[in-house]
């Protein structure tokens, strides 16, 4: 195990204390920047903390502050205000995926025992039906709604009433002492809601992840917040980490505008899933090739890496045009949620933008391991956090096993589902369902997902993610999944690659027969793999795969 130099992190026991520390230290610093109705907005740490007090006081007036409160909608300042408001109570925040079907939303609201729903305008059309099918909800509060009607309230008026009550001396919300051992965040895992489980996270879980994550990977003054807030990766590793660090959070308004907003806000760091890093990587090389500079770029990377070995770092100058494309201030991209291709990590590190790869899962709040700033190997997902014990279960002769985690970040269990909880939590160890290896330096390598495992009829086990990484190296492949080919009796006899190709890249590369070309290129890309891991069938899709809200392909 290497000697790791940990960052000094200011300790805190609760999210409420963390916010009080921020206001004490940087009251007038900008906490949030965002666009609303085509107008730029800025909110200081003091103003944000006051807004949470106003919303919290309004909830106290309804006697709902210790209850289950759901929120659904696009990433927004109002969404985050409700989020932090509830984290400072003894109630429970239920973030709901805005991409769920109406029926699935109803199931989540019922299963979570939510009694208040904060919602975006898109869901106004469902409120009357929710009233009939979600009997426990007592109040609906619309972010864009202008007027109150019975128990359907305007958020602006709701916050205003809370402010008036607070300023008249109602300090009940402010006097709450959170019990950090109790359920605070109830997050429903992605998937069909019939199978979705409510992951119970305590405040202690959240505090552990924020504190120990910052020990190994620091953040900087400005970030762009991109990923959906109902996912713990962004809600905890993105938002709470930034607030602890007193960073300015710039809220991305649309996934299609990420590069545009990087130019607008000029962030120093950003949290992403690998799909975004893949797009950025291919865009850089595509631009280089279209301008005839791809060979020069390759040479510059080699020269830069040689110079760095003798202590000369010219990356900011050598790759100035690339840095300018990313706002000219980007220092770090933190990638989680799925494995990232090794060559992408090495490329960004070579040009002077640190790509830090980590591993997390909702049930672990979510961070389990991450590459350290000073000990970064993008082919791994780094070392476990200091609050984490990690082991591999049922290890194969190749050294692979199921990743099991114990520590302060591990969930309390699944909400109202003791059977499923017992299946994955055994003697304090959480069985993740992910498989991996641990190298000689103690770093974790993810090899695949248990549920994706392909067992061939010859008894060989294949993790499709490994082969997909090779295929994604083909420049005009936009998306791929590898799956088993079943015979008449259901046995998996071989491997099929289902691919979606980039029409733009096909035209740019002047590929006349994409169907033939992709089969040839996949054969070449996987030639070094064992025979049983090679592709025997290729299917070309005419449209993209269906994806989750964090841009992961639904298998």
Tell what function each PLM region has.
Residues 100, 407, 412-413, 435-531:
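AMP-binding/adenylate-forming catalytic core of the ANL superfamily
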Residues 41-42, 56-100, 270, 314-444, 450-453, 478:
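Conserved AMP-binding/adenylate-forming
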Residues 143-144, 478-479, 490, 523-552:
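AMP-binding/adenylate-forming catalytic domain of the ANL superfamily
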Residues 27-30, 142, 163-188, 195, ...:
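Conserved pre-ATP/AMP-binding loop-to-beta segment of ANL
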Residues 88-161, 503:
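Structural core segment of the AMP-binding/adenylate-forming
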Residues 207-225, 229-320, 354:
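Conserved AMP-binding/adenylation subdomain of ANL enzymes
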Residues 42-46, 184-210:
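Conserved AMP-binding A3 loop
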